[in-house]
């Protein structure tokens, strides 16, 4: 299951980067989970990017600034939500919304007009906790 799902996710990542996913976004985010430290989960996420594309990888994603998040979706290719358990339950609706966005609209600094940019980024995450998402 993991290999098939990961393969499908990687196809979605490539489609997102190539601009082939204009009608829908890559709304799936694989989560690497191990209770033990030192399993190199974060390192695995980082090496998914080819050396030439490492400037388009980020592992600092702050959900408190929604406009900043939207800009990162247009600037980066892979966003690692490292230590996913640090995000609060109240932030999950905003994250879900961000993961489903296909086109981004925001005003850049010192500009009066809004920019419309395609979403490039896909998500991946890591955690040491196994009970990450719970529905009430």
Where do the language-model regions lie?
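Conserved nucleotide-state-sensing and coupling region of NTP-binding domains
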Residues: 29-31, 85, 112-115
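Charged, alpha-helix-enriched surfaces in structured cytosolic catalytic cores
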Residues: 5, 89-90, 118
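P-loop NTPase catalytic core of nucleic-acid-dependent motor ATPases
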Residues: 1-75
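Conserved AAA+/SF3 P-loop NTPase catalytic/coupling segment centered on the Walker-B
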Residues: 76-99, 131-136
